[in-house]
């Protein structure tokens, strides 16, 4: 029998065990103090930018999210990239023709911060249909670093999610799906301009509360009822319960509108495909042709 070599190596990323010391209250309080230093200006569209409007930000944010999803980036990459983008736009007037270049640059930086194998400049340029050259991306990277004052360790909503999950009376089997739902809400909030001024801790708490509400986990424990959960999380982040409740409602409303738009897009595409099939399957009678 011939000797055969079996390669058992895989491309899975090696991860360290979760350190419980990173989930203590001292770390949480430090993040709550630090998050204010990384908040972008909520009115930069009026005060700083002359060409860029909220609709353009929405378009480039959706594109950035699609790139991150297709490249299977870490969950933290997209919100961090959007934080860089908003902070840059808060201080530097930018032409609308350079907005996609800025978005690609922010993903480039965030990927370096959070990925074991970061995105390359060449790959990001491909996603711009080669409208951006690698050299331009690297030049923009230096400009972005300068405007961000080389402070890239932004506090994002993802940093708070694990702290909240560790404090909630949730079975371990439910934590994974709850975490995934909360991360999805965080990414959704990052695409919407209405959450630019919201602190990361508020977005994270609202996302966790909305996830618990959506998964009906509140029925398993009285502590997870809507009012009790809101009061508890507001105490953790030192916020007013009404503000947190309003944030949660905004997130739920954003989810509904996003799902509605997605369904409309799917139905439109389906109708278009059906029309194309009908046209291709129905031969034209020569007598109907007006020569």
UniProtKB/Swiss-Prot annotation:
Gene Ontology cellular component terms for the protein in this record: cyclin-dependent protein kinase holoenzyme complex; cytoplasm; microtubule organizing center; nucleus; transcription repressor complex
Keyword set includes Cell membrane: no
Residues the record lists as Phosphothreonine modifications: 282
Pfam families in the cross-refs: Cyclin_C (PF02984), Cyclin_N (PF00134)
Compartments it resides in: Nucleus; Cytoplasm
InterPro entries hit by this protein: Cyclin, Cyclin-like_dom, Cyclin-like_sf, Cyclin_C-dom, Cyclin_N, Cyclins_cyclin-box
Keyword tRNA processing among record annotations: no
GO process annotations (BP): camera-type eye morphogenesis; cell division; DNA damage response; G1/S transition of mitotic cell cycle; mitotic G1 DNA damage checkpoint signaling; negative regulation of transcription by RNA polymerase II; neuron cellular homeostasis; positive regulation of G1/S transition of mitotic cell cycle
Keyword annotations: Cell cycle, Cell division, Cyclin, Cytoplasm, Nucleus, Phosphoprotein, Transcription, Transcription regulation, Ubl conjugation
Gene Ontology MF terms in the entry: cyclin-dependent protein serine/threonine kinase regulator activity; transcription corepressor activity
Main location: nucleus
UniProt PTM comment: Phosphorylation at Thr-282 by MAP kinases is required for ubiquitination and degradation by the DCX(AMBRA1) complex. Ubiquitinated by the DCX(AMBRA1) complex during the transition from G1 to S cell phase, leading to its degradation. The DCX(AMBRA1) complex represents the major regulator of CCND1 stability during the G1/S transition.
Entry-linked Gene3D superfamilies: Cyclin-like
Subunit-structure text: Interacts with the CDK4 and CDK6 protein kinases to form a serine/threonine kinase holoenzyme complex. The cyclin subunit imparts substrate specificity to the complex.
Its biological purpose: Regulatory component of the cyclin D1-CDK4 (DC) complex that phosphorylates and inhibits members of the retinoblastoma (RB) protein family including RB1 and regulates the cell-cycle during G(1)/S transition. Phosphorylation of RB1 allows dissociation of the transcription factor E2F from the RB/E2F complex and the subsequent transcription of E2F target genes which are responsible for the progression through the G(1) phase. Hypophosphorylates RB1 in early G(1) phase. Cyclin D-CDK4 complexes are major integrators of various mitogenenic and antimitogenic signals.
Family (UniProt): Belongs to the cyclin family. Cyclin D subfamily.
Protein name: G1/S-specific cyclin-D1
Native source organism of the sequence: Danio rerio (Zebrafish)
């Amino acid at each position: 029998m011939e000797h055969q070599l079996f390669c058992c190596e895989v491309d899975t990323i090696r991860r360290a065990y979760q350190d419980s010391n990173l989930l203590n209250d001292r770390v949480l309080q430090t993040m709550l103090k630090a998050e204010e230093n990384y908040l972008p200006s909520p009115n930069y569209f009026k005060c700083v930018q002359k060409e860029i409007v909220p609709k353009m930000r929405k378009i480039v944010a959706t594109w950035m999210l699609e790139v991150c999803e297709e490249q299977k980036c870490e969950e933290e990459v997209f919100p961090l990239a959007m934080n860089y983008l908003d902070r840059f736009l808060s201080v530097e007037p930018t032409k609308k023709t350079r907005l996609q270049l800025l978005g690609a640059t922010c993903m480039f930086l965030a990927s370096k911060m959070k990925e074991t194998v970061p995105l390359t400049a060449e790959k990001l340029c491909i996603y711009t249909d080669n409208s951006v050259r690698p050299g331009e991306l690297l030049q923009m990277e230096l400009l972005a670093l300068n405007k961000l004052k080389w402070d890239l360790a932004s506090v994002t909503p993802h940093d708070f999610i694990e702290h909240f999950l560790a404090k909630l009376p949730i079975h371990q089997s439910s934590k994974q799906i709850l975490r995934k739902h909360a991360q999805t809400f965080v990414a959704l909030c990052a695409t919407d301009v209405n959450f630019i001024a919201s602190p990361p801790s508020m977005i994270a708490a609202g996302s966790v509360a909305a996830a618990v509400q959506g998964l009906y986990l509140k029925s398993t424990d009285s502590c997870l009822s809507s009012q009790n959960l809101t009061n508890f999380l507001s105490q953790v982040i030192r916020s007013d319960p009404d503000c947190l409740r309003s944030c949660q409602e905004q997130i739920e409303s954003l989810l509904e509108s996003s799902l509605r738009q997605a369904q409309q897009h799917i139905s439109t595409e389906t109708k278009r495909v059906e029309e194309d099939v009908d046209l291709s399957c129905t031969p034209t009678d020569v007598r109907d042709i007006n020569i």
